[in-house]
């Protein structure tokens, strides 16, 4: 059973198809404007030598752009390679949908870029409104203290806060996950939080931070360690690849990630494991699960850039 469900990520992917004879209205990525000095916030840094490998990968560049674009803009992308083929206006997409021209359009894109008919072209609206770094900054500061006290690397808190309902802490997923950490009821109760009709401690940031940190310590990290060992890797809690594997456990649950890791099999190193997980489906480990660590990395890189402005 999944530990928790990610809110709203499935909505990022609409399998829609576009045409080359479209008059394209490209809108440039708009950077977020901060009403609070960004240098007043804390950022849990990832070592540059570890980050550089992943930041060059097409999926990360793709999600970086999605996070910066407003919902009025849309990216046309090849699903498997994350090759960004076009940026069009959302109005143009709506017009194509209304006039039932999407299937013809998709084939035009495939033909133009040399893809087979069976390969998927996807369309993703910008999500800038969802990723509000100005609101996340103060939360990272508070969460870092809690995670440090419990002995868990606060990089996990930062990843989660950057991608889990950052602009709507009261969000509730269809599976019942609630709050900044999108905790399921049974997880919250396990760590002493009250979840009832009259009171829900998952809305209490300090208490939910404590529960998320303990979940990482007791469940996510140990399971990620065992999975790494099972395919011949030495788990290193300070390595980015291991932290991303742990994030997958937080998102999809150990059982689903274990199936995906087993499907990947033997790899040369942890970085290769993560890249292969991004393309692996096993059990309930599907598209949203693949995207989770990609979003974590892309949002971190954009957050870091935002703080440096």
PLM feature spans:
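Cell-wall glycan-active module
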Residues: 1-162, 171, 214, 218-239, ...
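Solvent-exposed loop/turn segments at secondary-structure junctions
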Residues: 165-168, 177, 187-190, 253-257, ...
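Functional cleft and adjacent loop/helix regions within the main domain
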Residues: 247
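Non-membrane alpha-helical structural segments and their capping/turn regions in soluble enzymes
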Residues: 137, 202, 206-210, 240, ...
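Substrate-binding/active-site groove segments that recognize
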Residues: 174-197, 207-220, 271
